[in-house]
Amino acid sequence: MERRYLKNPFPDFAGGENTPFASDEEHIKNLICTYVDAILEHCHPNSDDEDNRGDLYVGNAGIAFMFWKLNSCEQTRDLYPALDHAASFIRNAKVNANRYKKRSAERYSFLCGNAGIYAVSAAISQALKETEELSDDLANFKSGIPCSKEFMHTKYGCDEVLVGRAGYLSGCYWLNDVLPEKKITDDDLVSICQLIVTSGREYSKQNNSPCPLMYQYHGTEYLGAAHGLCAILHMLLDSPWFRTLPISAPAAELRDIKRSIDFFLELQDSDGNFPVALEDLRSGRDKRLVHWCHGAPGAVYVLAKAYLIFKEEKYLASLRRCADMVWKKGFLRKGPGICHGVAGNGYVFLLLFRLTNEMRYLYRAHKFMELLTNAEFKLRARTPDRPHSLYEGVAGTVCYLVDLLEPEQAYFPFMDVFH
């Protein structure tokens, strides 16, 4: 395991919880400019060299989202003509999206499909006040609603975040947050959630799972955020069922969702981490990754949402164990990105800071930023396959740095537990 991460070179926070923490905003802005300049140098929106798909995960839509975020932050809005760049990158992504329009699954595939492209385009069109383009973007995005309601079990799975229904829900929630009027109705959101619950129940029953709701992706019962249980449960908790008190979820749905969260919670090990997949427990294979996609850095979002809804201290205690483990083992050699890199792990501390207002977590978040320019990290870190992309590369790192400038509003892309 030690090969996967660098030893943390920083002392932990030594001040009291009310000790003010001074942020070096100019250093953060300079680092943002370093990464954005590299993106503009190496990524050209009208070229297919960098990406042939255009999606949010590693394509032009992800870079467009980064520029949209730069424009959304008062402190970074004037660093670049961000909306112009966002429009250029999303335009190319939509050209690529046209090739896949006839595939129904593409219409609700968010991080790795057409739905994410049109969602980001809608936000950009809104910012540019392009009403006709916004209308077209929303129509294309909402074409995923009927497709996502088709009940199906495939050998690949269709409920997770990257390409499935949970990811589509995350896009619906995000659009409803960033657009001035709610565009996706509660009825549509609830019907998708109901189908996800039904799917999880049926799979669990068919496979004698110990968890009331269980899902698979390519035959593996993943537990992490990218393909697995914890992010699916998070998106169910974000639904209208849990938006107000008293909770409006039907009793059976509430029972199965809560029991599934508590089942997942019990899988946390003494270090504070979680298994990659349920099969690891059955086989005795001890594979523990410290990534957003697999492990505690992605699990924190469902735990935080559960804490906010159910007010049970066990969820906060679990979150603190996650954060302490990430502080020890989260300086990954896999690069600076948010899926399986330093910035994604740094987001754990921004989440805990928003949740607790404790300065130790903001301090830790800043130390993860400092690691990006650490000599050992620059020497030993690997270069991702898509080094400038949103999830694997520095476009996601830029989003993390922007959030360091406004930590009270920080959120991992499309996973805001406070919305």
UniProtKB/Swiss-Prot annotation:
Any one Gene Ontology BP term: peptide modification
CDD domains found in the cross-reference section: euk_LANCL
Origin: domain of life: Eukaryota
GO cellular component, one term: plasma membrane
Matching SUPFAM superfamilies: LanC-like
Similarity field: Belongs to the LanC-like protein family.
Stated name of the protein: LanC-like protein 3 homolog
Organism lineage: Eukaryota, Metazoa, Ecdysozoa, Arthropoda, Hexapoda
